Amino acid sequence: GIFDKLKNFAKGVAQSLLNKASCKLSGQC
């Protein structure tokens, strides 16, 4: 359903934001 799509989209966005943040913190960008 649409809610599943939204949930998956939000999960993907959160994941990429986390990846960017941890990459900046560890200085491995």
Swiss-Prot record:
<comment type="similarity">
    <text>Belongs to the frog skin active peptide (FSAP) family. Brevinin subfamily.</text>
</comment>
<dbReference type="GO" id="GO:0031640">
    <property type="term" value="P:killing of cells of another organism"/>
</dbReference>
<protein>
    <recommendedName>
        <fullName>Brevinin-2Ee</fullName>
    </recommendedName>
</protein>
<dbReference type="InterPro" id="IPR012521">
    <property type="entry name" value="Antimicrobial_frog_2"/>
</dbReference>
<keyword id="KW-0878">Amphibian defense peptide</keyword>
<feature type="disulfide bond">
    <location>
        <begin position="23"/>
        <end position="29"/>
    </location>
</feature>
<keyword id="KW-1015">Disulfide bond</keyword>
<keyword id="KW-0044">Antibiotic</keyword>
<keyword id="KW-0354">Hemolysis</keyword>
<dbReference type="GO" id="GO:0005576">
    <property type="term" value="C:extracellular region"/>
</dbReference>
<keyword id="KW-0204">Cytolysis</keyword>
<keyword id="KW-0929">Antimicrobial</keyword>
<dbReference type="GO" id="GO:0042742">
    <property type="term" value="P:defense response to bacterium"/>
</dbReference>
<dbReference type="Pfam" id="PF08023">
    <property type="entry name" value="Antimicrobial_2"/>
</dbReference>
<comment type="function">
    <text>Shows antibacterial activity against representative Gram-negative and Gram-positive bacterial species, and hemolytic activity.</text>
</comment>
<keyword id="KW-0964">Secreted</keyword>
